Each structure stands twice: as structure tokens, then as C-alpha cells.
């Protein structure tokens, strides 16, 4: 049986709690496969863009029709839906990768980052207050933020292949 061929570029949304390992995974995955990696929150903070401006820049970048990863600014179902719609409008096939890590590990990583228990707690509480777990129709590819990059990559590739097969 011949596999289904999907010629659309992929827009990979990488989602997870702070210090879950999403940025580490996204950067390594992008480097391994020669993909662009964008962070909406970083675009807004470092360049002073509004969310709309950051999404417009992404829309311009999508004209390249190259598969890419994006993280940040996709913490709610509404934000992810907006991103999926933009990707589809630009001819991309969206996929959601959800990096999960237990809360104890996240808190430990945040304590190391901030060198303060109170600052770590404050940051975690603020960052997760509005966060919404993906719902079934989003079909997230779930990765552990504690697994090796090689294991994460195998799971991500398998999950992406499964999405193609399910169409």
C-alpha cells in the first residue's frame, strides 16, 4: 500500500508550560531538520510588536512555504485556533506538539532559573493562569519534557506520520 503524500509545508506549534522543555525541544528539532523557529512572545518582547504585528510577520515568513516551528503566544485554544487558521490560509498543514513535564520538575527548573522560590512561584502562577490544555480535536502530539531529545524526536516524527495517515 502506497503512503499518502502531503505536499503542504507543516506549521508545528510547540506548546507547554514554562520550563517544560518546549523551547529546548523546538530549538534542537529546528536545528536537526534545518527548520526556522519562531517565538511569538519573543517577537513581541524583543521587537515591541503587538500580537497582530507578530502574526503579520509570521504570515509574511510563511510565503516561503517552508516547514517551521512556532512557540509562545499559543497558550489558549483561541490563540492556537487563530494560529491554525493563519497557517491554513497560507497553505500550511498545522500540527500541535504538546511538551508535558510534571509540576515538581517545572518548579525545580524555575527555581534554578530565577534563583528564588518566590519569584519562581510568582512566574509559574502568572504564566499558567490563562493556559488551556489542548482539546481532543486539536490532536496534540504529546512529548515528555523529561525524555531525551532522540526519544522526543522519534515520538514527534511518528505523531506527524500518524496525522498524515488519519487524513
Language-model-detected regions and their locations in the chain:
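Phosphate-binding P-loop
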Residues: 2-9, 61
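Hydrophobic anchor at the beta1->P-loop junction of P-loop NTPases
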Residues: 14
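Conserved substrate/cofactor phosphate-moiety recognition/catalytic segment
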Residues: 17-66
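Conserved beta-strand scaffold positions in the cores of enzyme catalytic domains, especially
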Residues: 37, 94-96, 140-142
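Conserved nucleotide-binding/hydrolysis micro-motifs of P-loop NTPases
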Residues: 43-44, 75-76, 100-105, 148
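Glycine-rich phosphate-binding loop used to anchor ATP phosphates in small-molecule kinases
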Residues: 49-94
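Conserved phosphate-donor/acceptor-positioning beta-strand/loop module used by diverse small-molecule
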Residues: 88-110
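Small-molecule kinase domains that catalyze NTP-dependent phosphoryl transfer to phosphate-bearing small molecules
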Residues: 115-156, 160-167
Amino acid at each position: 500500500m502506497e503512503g499518502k503524500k502531503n505536499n503542504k509545508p507543516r506549521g508545528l506549534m510547540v506548546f507547554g508550560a514554562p520550563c517544560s522543555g518546549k523551547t529546548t525541544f523546538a530549538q534542537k528539532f529546528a536545528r536537526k531538520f534545518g527548520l526556522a523557529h519562531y517565538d511569538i512572545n519573543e517577537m513581541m518582547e524583543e521587537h515591541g510588536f503587538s500580537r497582530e504585528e507578530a502574526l503579520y510577520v509570521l504570515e509574511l515568513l510563511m510565503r516561503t512555504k517552508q516547514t517551521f516551528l512556532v512557540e509562545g503566544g499559543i497558550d489558549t485554544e483561541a490563540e492556537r485556533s487563530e494560529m491554525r487558521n493563519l497557517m491554513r490560509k497560507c497553505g500550511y498543514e498545522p500540527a500541535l506538539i504538546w511538551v508535558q513535564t510534571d509540576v515538581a520538575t517545572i518548579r525545580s527548573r524555575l527555581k534554578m532559573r530565577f534563583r528564588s522560590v518566590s519569584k519562581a512561584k510568582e512566574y509559574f502562577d502568572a504564566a499558567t493562569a490563562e493556559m488551556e490544555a489542548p482539546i481532543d480535536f486539536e490532536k496534540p502530539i504529546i512529548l515528555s519534557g523529561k525524555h531525551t531529545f532522540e526519544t522526543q524526536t522519534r515520538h514527534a516524527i511518528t505523531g506527524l506520520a500518524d496525522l498524515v495517515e488519519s487524513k
